[in-house]
Amino acid sequence: QTRETVEEYPIIDYIIKENKQAYQYLEKQLSRLPRNENVKVLVVDDSTSTRRYICSLLKRHKYQILEAKDGKDVLEVLESQKDVSVIITDNEMPNMNGDELCVEIRRLYSNDEKAIIGISGADSSALSSLFLKNGANDYLHKPFNSEEFYCRLSQNVDMLEQIATIKRQANTDYLTNLPNRRYFFEESSKSLKYLKKSNQDGALAMLDIDHFKSINDTYGHDSGDEVLKGLAVCFKKYFEKQLVARLGGEEFAVYFTDATTAQALKRLEGFRQFIELNSQEFSQEKIKFTISIGFASGPIYQIDELL
């Protein structure tokens, strides 16, 4: 009775203060709300009234909301709005059912890229398993109460964020926040495959801090780290449109995706000169250093060969 009374009002949530978990849930929800403003949810249903109801629930929790009336609309929205995080879809719709839509979405995106929540008012107990087997992350039976809706939605958004964090940590160098060696090899290899198909040349440069060991020996490893971090900031800005990475130690790499050999060489020489003139600004000890650059280009389609 309390639930039914409370849910008549446009509240965000309500919590019964029974135990410590209630306060932990409250804290989690309060931290969740500001982040929801950056989360796009796509609501799919051929029923206008159902879409409006679900959108009203999402609006309370500050989600960005997109709508579609059938599977065809969904695929068009996902083509233009690639940052959609969650798709909430009904099952019985014209042209394409919800379980069929799950299959189409999973052709393009994995479970850890976009979450799908199926909903249906059908009495069939097999429908939930059909949704899940076809790629949905979760399922709700209509009519559902707002509490369950919010809990399931939050859990799926949390899961996506946690996976994104793990991926980011796995692909990022902890010291410089540049992409690491693993990510660089994966992404540049994908690009080289495309270049091979289109009969284009690849271009890659390796950069190394000259006599970096002597910097660590003379000024200490903390100062050496400052030098690496300062160089990384300039590196990222100077080659903003290129794939850059720290390969390890004092070695960095840049893969050119949209530059001719002449343009790449000119850019690299400009960067080398900039570092030579401004390197003392990277550390408290005003350590001056220089960099050496190796460059390779041509019809080479294995990243190991270019390196």
Residue ranges, per PLM feature:
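Alpha4 helix (beta4-alpha4-beta5 surface) of REC/receiver domains from two-component response regulators
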Residues: Q1-D13, E100, D112-E113, A122-D138
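Acidic catalytic/metal-coordinating carboxylates
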Residues: D70-D73, N97-L101
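Conserved nucleotide-binding and Mg2+-coordinating catalytic segments in signaling enzymes
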Residues: K167-E186, L207-H221, K229
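Active-site-proximal structural segments of metal-dependent nucleotidyl cyclase/transferase enzymes
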Residues: E187-Y219, F235, A245
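Hydrophobic framework residues that shape the active-site pocket
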Residues: D208, F212, L231, L247, ...
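Catalytic-core segments of nucleotide cyclases and related cyclic-nucleotide turnover enzymes
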Residues: D217, L265-E269, S283, A296-L307
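Active-site-proximal alpha-helical element of nucleotidyl cyclase-like catalytic domains
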Residues: S223-L243
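A short pre-motif secondary-structure segment
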Residues: V244-R246, I287
